[in-house]
Curated annotation (Swiss-Prot):
UniProt feature coiled coil, ranges: none
Name by which UniProt lists this protein: Phosphoribosylaminoimidazole-succinocarboxamide synthase
PROSITE patterns: SAICAR_SYNTHETASE_1, SAICAR_SYNTHETASE_2
UniProt source species: Acinetobacter baumannii (strain ATCC 17978 / DSM 105126 / CIP 53.77 / LMG 1025 / NCDC KC755 / 5377)
Pfam families: SAICAR_synt
Length: 239
């Protein structure tokens, strides 16, 4: 598969066309960003760690019957994926209160949410990825009611699979975001799953093992990502 034209440069990944109309190549970079690009740094090895971690998670989800865009790793920083028609709405599941939920609702961080909450956010950096509801997403043509329902069902299924997986590594899956797209009329999980897009805490100490270490200036960001990988048995020895 030949990498061709650069299609898009995101906050932490670059997207390239290939010589196959149904596939793209994603390149994971070492960039770390927070607060809609107001804080940006380069973190050595981050791209390699996230690429390998994402591949591990995508394979686990596929084993659970969840279709993803992941095809195969091409290099330490590159992955071949299906070319999806992306839906510009992020799905967020929260198992515990953290981040913007605490700020919006005055909830104490760490409060368990039973059942887990489900939220939608419109993907637009210029607007700060605002929270939206289903009727807005449908009325504005971002997704159909059927697509949104499928996305919701799949997001909860991902939550069930990954809560159990992280629990095996003595970690709490606090919250996470997912992006979906359409591939040959099917709703398929896209983008990535890594500590960049979720919150993970040590079950006993509540040590943060995710991107909040970067947002909050706690340090040891990549080291925390590597710790998460090690707890799950993700082999990083060759990168």
């Amino acid at each position: 598969m030949l990498k061709q034209t650069l299609l898009y440069t995101g906050k932490a990944k670059s997207v390239y066309e290939t010589d196959n109309a149904d596939h793209l190549i994603l390149v994971f970079r070492d960039d770390a960003s927070a607060f809609n690009g107001e804080k940006i740094e380069q973190l050595d090895r981050k791209g390699k760690v996230n690429n390998r971690f994402n591949a591990f998670i995508m394979e686990k989800l596929a084993e659970a019957g969840i279709e993803t865009h992941f095809e195969k790793l091409l290099s330490p920083t590159e992955v071949l994926v299906k070319k999806l028609q992306m839906i510009p709405v992020e799905c967020v599941i929260r198992n515990y209160a953290a981040g913007s939920l605490c700020r919006r609702l005055g909830v104490e961080e760490g409060k368990e949410l039973t059942p887990p909450t489900f939220e939608l956010f419109y993907k637009d950096d210029g607007l700060g990825d605002p929270m939206v509801n289903e009727s807005q997403a449908i009325a504005l043509g971002w997704a159909t009611a059927e697509q949104l329902e499928q996305m919701k069902v799949l997001t909860y299924k991902v939550n069930d699979v990954l809560k159990a997986l992280f629990a095996e590594g003595n970690m709490i899956l606090v919250d996470f975001k997912l992006e979906f797209g359409v591939f040959h009329d099917r709703i398929v999980l896209g983008d990535e799953f890594s500590p960049d897009g979720c919150r993970l805490w040590d079950k006993d100490t509540k040590k943060k093992l995710d991107k909040d270490r970067f947002r909050q200036g706690l340090g040891g960001v990549v080291e925390a990502y590597e710790e998460v990988a090690a707890r799950l048995g993700v082999d990083l020895s060759d990168i």
